[in-house]
């Protein structure tokens, strides 16, 4: 859709959880990077599934089973269209981004990485996009290499080209950093990887909720994301993989539905995408994810981008009026809707606890990015993040709470 704005007040009404008060204050939920809230439209389709056609898929010919199968496979088609994948078989439903990346590391990685090969990542990665590759490198006696970052936590083309070479077999990179808000040029990185015969696996957990994705344009070999960060249910994720790669990969989980034929001593596997979806799949969650995608598409990514950009820049400017507050990452005009910060000498957990008393929900800790924390020279940070239901009032509430927090911790008892 081409709309450049939406009625945020109307959007807020779609999220029942935002109606409540926290500590007798209006709730300012600024933790969507960890988990977004869920609109009533998604809640309704989940309720409808369990009330009207709760059944297993693929196996039954009865009416409820057919309805459930249609809902599940229609959800797959919705995801395919959403990211412009070429084939429906390229969409694998998983438990989330972490599970998706692990499938790639274990199935593709174990079969294609040998001693002396190189796997390229960055220090800005979530643990879900470091640990699987770290373990793969250990299993195969391969080398894990890191693309250097600038002081603002961005990647430069020369450094990317200098790190990826003919020994590189896999490049694993976040489209958007969950800490810094850095937006990586994954299309260019994919092109460089392919020039050296490597594949690229993109962690899209922080991009899928916020920007239009086109797998034909990006040319990623694998792309992973989660439903719960994009207005959908928890427990559902997506692994996109190019069909020719997935066809040659072995399944990593075994059981019902993913088989073609089972004898006493051997088995053969079902075709894509089923061979990667062992057991009863995430039926309700997939249907809920599809509805979340419809909701996002109705708002339009242009409008979502403009809304988040305005909020992020406003928050960036207002937060920097507080003495002793340091923001990490790129400048305000080159970041996604994430602001990670520290306030004077106050521990981030104390900051998060203090602002919570004022109804403000932010995240504190290492954000599953300990190598990045070490790179920043800190043990932890606080983080505010913005989505479609946030307003300048939320930002003002955060800034006021931070000022009160600083004043409280500066008081000499």
Swiss-Prot record:
Record-linked CDD domains: SufS_like
PANTHER family assigned? CYSTEINE DESULFURASE, CYSTEINE DESULFURASE 1, CHLOROPLASTIC
Query: What GO terms in the biological process aspect are recorded for it?
Result: cysteine metabolic process
Q: Looking at the Swiss-Prot or TrEMBL record, what is one Pfam family this protein matches? A: Aminotran_5
Enzyme class, top EC level, equals transferase
What's its catalytic activity? Answer: (sulfur carrier)-H + L-cysteine = (sulfur carrier)-SH + L-alanine
Which co-factors does it depend on? pyridoxal 5'-phosphate
UniProt-listed NCBIfam families: sufS
List the active site: 368
The identity of this protein, by name, is: Probable cysteine desulfurase
Per the record, the similarity remark reads: Belongs to the class-V pyridoxal-phosphate-dependent aminotransferase family. Csd subfamily.
Q: What does this protein do?
A: Catalyzes the removal of elemental sulfur and selenium atoms from L-cysteine, L-cystine, L-selenocysteine, and L-selenocystine to produce L-alanine.
Write out the GO MF terms: cysteine desulfurase activity; pyridoxal phosphate binding
